[in-house]
Amino acid sequence: MTDLHTDVERYLRYLSVERQLSPITLLNYQRQLEAIIHFASENGLQSWQQCDVTMVRNFAVRSRRKGLGAASLALRLSALRSFFDWLVSQNELKANPAKGVSAPKAPRHLPKNIDVDDMNRLLDIDINDPLAVRDRAMLEVMYGAGLRLSELVGLDIKHLDLESGEVWVMGKGSKERRLPIGRNAVAWIEHWLDLRDLFGSEDDALFLSKLGKRISARNVQKRFAEWGIKQGLNNHVHPHKLRHSFATHMLESSGDLRGVQELLGHANLSTTQIYTHLDFQHLASVYDAAHPRAKRGK
């Protein structure tokens, strides 16, 4: 057994005896560290003292090339950093060579937006009871203002200014923003407020459950999914998809990335750029109409 294996065995015993980690967690550590042992041996290392940041980076690159996903690589590097930290604490290493090495961020999988025709079909629900009116109002507000789910369920009646067609929301980081919600949303909120007292609630919440309490995020998710099925949409409807659709449709219509950023409450423009995607056909038409080099010569 090489010094590489010996040190890993010692570390695993430490995790088992002193840290009292579960067998499954220990097995995960063992698998990750066996991968680096194999790589180090291939590169002629006899001890961990010979390992440097370049070797760790090469190990990360090799892992990615062999098909390891970004999230799995992050776990592998985390296990390696913990192991090297332990070696430093045992005076086996002077510094942790993996400390400055990080895995690439996992790609963000954005939900597909609902196109305008399907959105109109979703909103055209059969209003046959007060809860259906409530759901129509929630759908209109969510799509009309691009709210986060937490912002929707957190709305109180006092946050409304129906005369101006605006709503105040508390976003991430306790940041308030004032948003237009559109005349359709205003009309359906007014319709819902006429029925809201049927639930006999003294709660300040705008949207109530059938028990008269503030509606929960889970309940909203469930109701939106049910309406998607009832209205014959082919894809799963959830609150985040409505927010994404709002952003996409606004950006396609206006091209104003900064304006959409403000409406969504994003701190960084880069978040909006990732979150909203213009389809290539729309971009091409904008380019053809606006760019001087795209115009046909006379």
Swiss-Prot record:
GO terms for biological process: cell division; chromosome segregation; DNA transposition. Gene3D superfamilies: 1.10.150.130, Intergrase catalytic core. It is found in: Cytoplasm. The active site is at residues 148, 172, 240, 243, 266, 275. One of its GO terms (cellular component) is cytoplasm. Keywords: Cell cycle, Cell division, Chromosome partition, Cytoplasm, DNA integration, DNA recombination, DNA-binding. Residues 2-88 form the Core-binding (CB) domain. FtsK may regulate the catalytic switch between XerC and XerD in the heterotetrameric complex during the two steps of the recombination process. Its main location: cytoplasm. It comes from the Bacteria. Residues 109-288 form the Tyr recombinase domain. One of its GO terms (molecular function) is tyrosine-based site-specific recombinase activity. Site-specific tyrosine recombinase, which acts by catalyzing the cutting and rejoining of the recombining DNA molecules. Binds cooperatively to specific DNA consensus sequences that are separated from XerD binding sites by a short central region, forming the heterotetrameric XerC-XerD complex that recombines DNA substrates. The complex is essential to convert dimers of the bacterial chromosome into monomers to permit their segregation at cell division. It also contributes to the segregational stability of plasmids. In the complex XerC specifically exchanges the top DNA strands. Belongs to the 'phage' integrase family. XerC subfamily. Forms a cyclic heterotetrameric complex composed of two molecules of XerC and two molecules of XerD, in which XerC interacts with XerD via its C-terminal region, XerD interacts with XerC via its C-terminal region and so on. This is Tyrosine recombinase XerC. It comes from Escherichia coli O1:K1 / APEC.
